Swiss-Prot record:
Active site per the UniProt annotation: 42 (proton acceptor), 153 (proton donor)
Species of provenance: Callithrix jacchus
3'-nitrotyrosine PTM positions: 60
Cited InterPro entries: RNaseA (IPR001427), RNaseA-like_dom_sf (IPR036816), RNaseA_AS (IPR023411), RNaseA_domain (IPR023412)
Assembly information from the UniProt record: Interacts with and forms a tight 1:1 complex with RNH1. Dimerization of two such complexes may occur.
Positions contributing to substrate binding: 65-69
Any one biological process term the GO annotation gives: chemotaxis
One term under GO cellular component: extracellular space
Stated name of the protein: Non-secretory ribonuclease
Amino acid sequence: MVPKLFTSQICLLPLLGLLSAEGSPHARPQQYSRAQWFSIQHIQTAPLHCTSAMRAINKYQSRCKNKNTFLHTTFADVVNVCGNTNMTCPHNASLNNCHHSGVQVPLTYCNLTGPQTISNCVYSSTQANKFYVVACENRDPRDPPQYPVVPVHLDTII
């Protein structure tokens, strides 16, 4: 009985390795800091249709991301939100590094509607003006030195 249990545990190890090698569906490309990846995924000063805008994100992940929100503002403006009062992150109560925007910004919400093959992801676009909540962290050496604290995660749209 014991050898069988031991063998079954050993058999799970390669599977666990495959799962971790695959990575999270939201894993950032290693060449980017968390703030740089935040900017690629969520900052778009001028609205583009989602099908076009999502190509840049999908090419890094080699898959069609199910949904995404683009804030039509500047990275510097979102950095300024990091200076607002800390709050518990609405979508992750264990984190206390979130900040409410305090002002509404124009944004585009993209939702995957078409084929899920990387060569032809199709999205619907919904435009709105909303508040947002971002998680912020101390900058990575790859981030602009003028920003000691930078946004790394778009937690909620309100």
